[in-house]
């Protein structure tokens, strides 16, 4: 008689436990046990419980390879979902086997789990294990499907179609499943979030935290009448009265210094969209800036051509915004532009704007604005640039290049890699809650009656159009961080804390990935010969990049260095890159004139006519301001249940080498965090968005 001691861990999140019956079957190389009910006197499988059980077998089962968890109805109780963390089994010879689950069992079902050692297809020889791999992938591909959200954008996780309940007093003008949360000013497509699989949803704690923060803020705006006010702001200082939540050093600094040229230039380096600016070596024909125009702003003893040759001239070009249509908000036509902004990095170490053109086509009705123009002309020209920056940030840098791409990475992972695959173990922590937050984003942002329809001048169609254009130009090289800085010519630009911190995190991450990859892939042949890996890469190319060859994204990977680069890009995109464009979002957008989502008057065509009154009349009205601010506040505040980069409480790797690599990675991140905090002590505006302590493992907000 062989005795196996079993430990079963239930998740710690509220409602993780179950009243259903749980049975276990153990499969080894020399046989399998009978199905045995795991049952003690009293409650089993309560939230946070680690139950200990004994399984008796007539003979030793040999090396344990698979277990089966059977979830069945208990007495008269209704179906009760269960979140299983892991199962550990101590064999008669004293060896401990670990079977990671970290997933929900929703209905009455059987879940087969493999022993935790990471293995590629080439590492498996037993027919039962090879068949298990195939069956797991087949089941996931039957369950998780790709779906086109909008043509030209990455595909996303299909939400099953449910017939809405019949309502006697249904509004025929409201799309099915759209509704309001009390006080919240926009429609939310509940179907996009309600029917997600449990394994893709927020935990109960995170869900509660998210909606508890949302409701009171919305109701406060509603009670004060702000969400019904379609008038212009009377005074700039009135905008400060709607600052949401707790103010910070940065948000206060933004409100005080937003109109200054030095802060305007600073945001291109260390704001929430720090990946746009590039060195300019030649003034483009479409932006006819002359030396006479800008010479007074370059300093003594120099000229525009000399500064171009020295590498001190930089360009922000918003050409991707050109020709996008606008909508009406609060009954008033909104306006749009695609500006160009020329900046100079002076000897005092500051990035300063020196010329702005509010169109991609020069002409008499499109003057070039200069710092020497009237105060309100220059300020309004800069505000138009900040308006374009809003869409460059929200549509491209934030939503497309992190959220939507990361969701495609996640779904391809689930559909093509079994849980025992080392890449699954490496990447799965970086997909946590991404599908859930993207479903919320689609329900709130890109929904008929949502934010883009009620708070943005481009509307749903225009906002999506910007992303479609950006995806058509996205390249693999641009996602490879070190190459991006070189390609934009900013690799040696002083005071670029985003670059310094992102490269530090990238290097730590790349070293960690290298150690893991080289442990499981000893040769290039091992990479090229892994069919599951190749299927994952191929599906990303097809569903995320839409099969566009010009993107430079690989269809397959042939060498170990290629795999290291690819995986590093994936993890960085899902963690640090998102933190860089998301964490500071509210601090830079809470003061609306610094980041307006709509403009109510056309771009100025004649100098000398702008006044405070015309400036205020161009900014968004009170209602639009509050709607935009409320939604951005909701979607930028990380709810509870956080997991900082490098913290992996779910144990997927059990081998000693990858465990050492994880610990070394954590130590490197701790050093980076210390260095960032020491540097920030000497800065007037601290840059902490890439402090590893504040970087989430995954895109979860």
From Swiss-Prot:
Chief subcellular location equals cytoplasm
User: Outcome of altering residue 664 to P?
Assistant: In ARCI2; complete loss of the enzyme activity
Q: Where does this protein act, in terms of pathway?
A: Lipid metabolism; hydroperoxy eicosatetraenoic acid biosynthesis; Lipid metabolism; sphingolipid metabolism
Reply yes or no: does the keyword Transcription regulation apply. Answer: no
**Cofactor stoichiometry and binding remark:** Binds 1 Fe cation per subunit.
Gene Ontology MF terms: arachidonate 12(R)-lipoxygenase activity; arachidonate 12(S)-lipoxygenase activity; arachidonate 8(R)-lipoxygenase activity; iron ion binding; isomerase activity; linoleate 9S-lipoxygenase activity; lyase activity; oxidoreductase activity, acting on single donors with incorporation of molecular oxygen, incorporation of two atoms of oxygen
Biological process terms from the Gene Ontology for this record are: arachidonate metabolic process; ceramide biosynthetic process; establishment of skin barrier; hepoxilin biosynthetic process; linoleic acid metabolic process; lipid oxidation; lipoxygenase pathway; positive regulation of gene expression
Q: How is this protein's activity kept under control?
A: Increased by calcium.
Upon changing residue 488 to H, the result is:
In ARCI2; complete loss of the enzyme activity
EC numbers on record = 1.13.11.-
What is its cofactor? Answer: Fe cation
Lineage top rank: taxon = Eukaryota
Q: What class of enzyme is it?
A: oxidoreductase
Query: Which residues are in the Lipoxygenase domain?
Result: 120-701
Q: For this UniProt record, give its keywords in alphabetical order, as a comma-separated list.
A: Cytoplasm, Dioxygenase, Disease variant, Fatty acid metabolism, Ichthyosis, Iron, Isomerase, Lipid metabolism, Lyase, Metal-binding, Oxidoreductase
Residues forming coiled coils: none
Q: Which chemical reaction does it catalyze?
A: (5Z,8Z,11Z,14Z)-eicosatetraenoate + O2 = (12R)-hydroperoxy-(5Z,8Z,10E,14Z)-eicosatetraenoate; N-[omega-(9Z,12Z)-octadecadienoyloxy]acyl-beta-D-glucosyl-(1<->1)-octadecasphing-4E-enine + O2 = N-[omega-(9R)-hydroperoxy-(10E,12Z)-octadecadienoyloxy]acyl-beta-D-glucosyl-(1<->1)-octadecasphing-4E-enine; a N-[omega-(9Z,12Z)-octadecadienoyloxy]-acylsphin-4E-enine + O2 = a N-[omega-(9R)-hydroperoxy-(10E,12Z)-octadecadienoyloxy]-acylsphin-4E-enine; (6Z,9Z,12Z)-octadecatrienoate + O2 = 10-hydroperoxy-(6Z,8E,12Z)-octadecatrienoate
Q: Summarize tissue expression.
A: Expressed in B-cells, hair follicles, foreskin keratinocytes and adult skin. Also expressed in psoriatic tissue.
Q: Which residues bind Fe cation?
A: 398, 403, 578, 582, 701
Q: Where in the cell is it found?
A: Cytoplasm; Cytoplasm, Perinuclear region
Q: Where is the PLAT domain?
A: 2-119
Q: Give the record's GO CC terms.
A: cytosol; intracellular membrane-bounded organelle; membrane; perinuclear region of cytoplasm
The function of this protein is: Catalyzes the regio and stereo-specific incorporation of a single molecule of dioxygen into free and esterified polyunsaturated fatty acids generating lipid hydroperoxides that can be further reduced to the corresponding hydroxy species. In the skin, acts upstream of ALOXE3 on the lineolate moiety of esterified omega-hydroxyacyl-sphingosine (EOS) ceramides to produce an epoxy-ketone derivative, a crucial step in the conjugation of omega-hydroxyceramide to membrane proteins.
Q: What is the associated disease?
A: Ichthyosis, congenital, autosomal recessive 2: A form of autosomal recessive congenital ichthyosis, a disorder of keratinization with abnormal differentiation and desquamation of the epidermis, resulting in abnormal skin scaling over the whole body. The main skin phenotypes are lamellar ichthyosis (LI) and non-bullous congenital ichthyosiform erythroderma (NCIE), although phenotypic overlap within the same patient or among patients from the same family can occur.
UniProt family annotation = Belongs to the lipoxygenase family.
Protein name (database record): Arachidonate 12-lipoxygenase, 12R-type
- Species whose genome carries this gene: Homo sapiens (Human)
Lineage, uppermost ranks:
Eukaryota, Metazoa, Chordata, Craniata, Vertebrata
